[in-house]
Amino acid sequence: MTETVLVIGATGHIGVSAVIGALRTKRNVLAVVRNAAAVDKLFRLAGTRDGITTVEADITSEHGLQSVVDKVKNGELPAFQHVYSAVGGVKTTTPLKDLSIEDFRANMSINFDTNFFAYRATIGYLLSQSNPTTYTVITGAIGDVGIWPGPAMSQGALYSLGISAELENRDTNVRFNEMYLAFPVMVDEEAVKEEAAKMGVVKASDFARSYENLLAKDEIKGSRIFIFTPGDIDTLRWESKAFKGPPS
C-alpha cells in the first residue's frame, strides 16, 4: 500500500516543500487547500498533479480539519499515515508596546490556533492505526530571537504544544517531531528572484529534502530537528524535546 501524507497549509512556502518531499519518497499527498484557485496554484508550484489529492477546508475554523478527517474515515478521501502541519505566516513587525489586541489575536489565530486545531483533529486518527505513523510541525526560530513580538509569542506557544505532544506520544505509534527552521524558505519561482537571493532564501524544492530525510529516519522521535543552515537540510541535527530539568 502506498502511504499518504496529509499536508496542512499546502500552498504556503513550507507546505509546498512538504508536498515535494513527500512525493519524492514515493508517497501520495492529501493537500488541504483554501479554494479552487489554490488547487491550480499548488499543482503549478509542486510541478505536478500526479499523486496529489486536494480537499478544501477552512483550517482557521475549529472544525475545518475535523471535517477532512471525517471524510477520510467515511472513505471519501484517501487514508493518511503522516501529517505535516505547515500553517502560519502572519509576520507583523509592530513593537510589543504598540501591538494592538487585534494584531495579537491575528498572530495567535493564524500561527498557533490553526496548529492546535490541526493536531487535535488528526492525532486520534493516527493513534488508531496499528502501524507506525508520523506527525511533523514546522516552527520558526523567531520565537527565540524575538525581533517580531507578535509572531515570536505565537511560536513560543507552539514550542510548548510540541513539548506536550512529545510527552503524550512518547510511548505510542506516532513519531511526533518539531522541525525548527532558522532561515527563509520560498517557493522556487520566488526564491530565484534577485532580492530573495540576496537574503539567502532557500528554494522550497531544496528544503524538501529535510522532510525526505526525516521520514527515512525512524530513530528520530519526540525531537526538535534544528535547521539552522542549508547544510542542516541533508545532515539532520536533533535533540529530544523531553524536559531535562534545570541546568547543572
UniProtKB/Swiss-Prot annotation:
Pfam family, any one: adh_short
Keywords attached to this entry: NADP, Oxidoreductase
Enzyme Commission code(s) on record: 1.1.1.-
EC class: oxidoreductase
Coiled coil, from the record: none
Phenotype of null mutants: Reduced strongly the production of iso-A82775C and accumulates pestalodiol F.
Induction line: Expression is co-regulated with the other genes from the iso-A82775C biosynthesis cluster and probably controlled by the cluster-specific transcription factors iacI and iacK.
Pathway annotation: Secondary metabolite biosynthesis
Application notes: Iso-A82775C is a precursor for the biosynthesis of the anticancer natural products chloropestolides A to E via a Diesls-Alder reaction with maldoxin. In the absence of the prenyltransferase iacE, siccayne accumulates instead of iso-A82775C and can also be condensed with maldoxin to produce chloropestolides H to K, which show also antibacterial and anticancer properties.
GO MF, any single term: oxidoreductase activity
Binding, NADP(+): I14, N35, K41, D58, R120, V187
Family (UniProt): Belongs to the short-chain dehydrogenases/reductases (SDR) family.
UniProt function note: Short-chain dehydrogenase/reductase; part of the gene cluster that mediates the biosynthesis of iso-A82775C, a enylepoxycyclohexane and biosynthetic precursor of the chloropestolide anticancer natural products. Within the cluster, the prenyltransferase iacE prenylates siccayne to generate pestalodiol E, using dimethylallyl diphosphate (DMAPP) as cosubstrate. The probable oxidoreductase iacF is then involved in the epoxidation of pestalodiol F to pestalodiol F, which is further converted to pestalofone A by the short-chain dehydrogenase/reductase iacG.
Full protein name: Short-chain dehydrogenase/reductase iacG
Species lineage: Eukaryota, Fungi, Dikarya, Ascomycota, Pezizomycotina
